[in-house]
Amino acid sequence: MPGLQTSNLAAAVVVATKLNLTLDQDCIDEAFMALSIAGRQQQLVAMDRLWWLDVAHNCESVARLAVAIAEKSDGVETHAIFGTMADKPLRAMIELISEGISSWHLPAHEGIARAANPADLAQLIKRISPKVAVQCYPTPESAFNGIENVSKPGDRIVVFG
């Protein structure tokens, strides 16, 4: 079950075992195989591109996402649409995942006071990865439209933050 977090289900199984509840091993196996969490490395195909949607918004979840990207790189270009809150550990988050990203697309989030400014994120990304392409957009919708112009069929687009 690559790309999915199983720790919560595993914890539930441990608790049930400690409480001496009877669990059917086939049901446990089936639950692990069927486990999926919307927004956690969720994969969709649209516009002939593979889209990964992940709510990764802290260092731990960004690190897991970076590992998943590295494990499934297969020479595929990976473009990121990234937005986050300004009070997050921005440098650390970007450093964790930057090696796997070919281009960054940073939308503004109008009306969200805590949202990180895309221009500030762009400066930080350029300091960490000077050669990578970075584009700022006024809205998330414009970032989605813009990424279609720089990506090609078969590319991966990771939307996270």
What would you call each of these model-derived segments?
Residues 82-84, 109, 160-161:
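Glycine-rich beta-strand-to-loop/alpha-helix junction loops that act as flexible
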Residues 22, 72-76, 147-157:
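Glycine-rich phosphate-binding loop signature in dinucleotide/nucleotide-binding domains
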